[in-house]
Amino acid sequence: MIVAERVTGVARSFIHQVGISRTAWLRAAAASLLLLALPFVLRLDGRAHADWLQFLGRFHPTLLHLPIGMIVLVPVLEIAGMKRPALREAADFVLRLALALALPTLALGYMLAYGAGDTGTTVSRHMWGAIVLCIGLMLCLLVRPAWAANQQAFIYPGLLVATLIALVWTGHEGGSITHGSD
């Protein structure tokens, strides 16, 4: 019980210090829990499911390049924004748009794997990487305002780097699914 109280206290302090509204925090936590629950609710069982899932899932390769480009663009805009502040505002917009596109990309990828009955270690790693990537984007959006207001120096850049690492890893796993591991 004492550990739970300490963790709760640290979390409240962090949320207050970073300036995250309770509503935004709860929305991000709920969305993260839904993303984390997805593989357990709809297990990739190796059996093909409804054809319409596979049909919609085939749009995953079409859509996925947009959020990838936007996620890579965000740190470029943040760095360039040191000299031109308007670019920092553009970075916020691009980050929001990247998340808005990453979530349906994740859903389409899951529809493709579930509808086709795909399984395997690479598919699983790609799926979990995409989930971590989306959660990382949500966390970046939550803490970015405090960083932009110079209240927190390292949390947002650290999360952004971690999100970029998740992007590279997830993209590599997706490429291995499409083109093979060699």
Positions of predicted regions on the chain:
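Polytopic transmembrane helical bundles with strong interfacial aromatic enrichment
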Residues: 2-182
